[in-house]
Amino acid sequence: MKISVYCSSAPDIDPALIDFAYELGKGIALAGHDLVWGGAKISAMGAVARGARENGAKTIGVIPRSLVDREIQDPNATELHLVDTMRERKALIEELSDGFIALPGGIGTLEEFFEIWVGRYLLFHSKPIAVLDPIGAYGPLREALEHLAGHKLMKSGQNELVSWTTQVEEALSAMAR
């Protein structure tokens, strides 16, 4: 199975979250899976790739050429696909992946997560989705989503398409759904 991980590329996030990203990559590898990710060597993105690669997984990166120009691509990726736009990046990651895990991240991570969630709801794919949040960063987001559902602004069944987890093992188990 090829598992996509959406996560932060921010340079100043908590080092514990970077360590956690490494552990997720390691868990992906030890479970016999490969990693698909945004192709960067920095922050949580770099850590998840190192964790996967150092434990035997293939690492398949998808990165826009403009980021290669900034030299943040992972030169050790097993495969590195270069694309022109973020839309192409997201589409290729979706195509290459069999499941998706979102770690805490910023607006880029959220945008990727929501797009893949909407795609699942609209039946463009049937691949599993998990949020892996060991620090409670997405707690307010989850509350907001429940608030929307309470006002009937979310359709029945949408929330059930995402597994909300706090541990690597839980997120990896969700990939088998």
Annotate the PLM regions.
Residues R53, G119-K127, L153-M154:
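Arginine/glycine-rich "motif VI" loop of SF2 helicases in the C-terminal RecA-like domain
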Residues M1-L96, P134-A176:
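A cross-family phosphate/adenosyl-ligand binding-site feature
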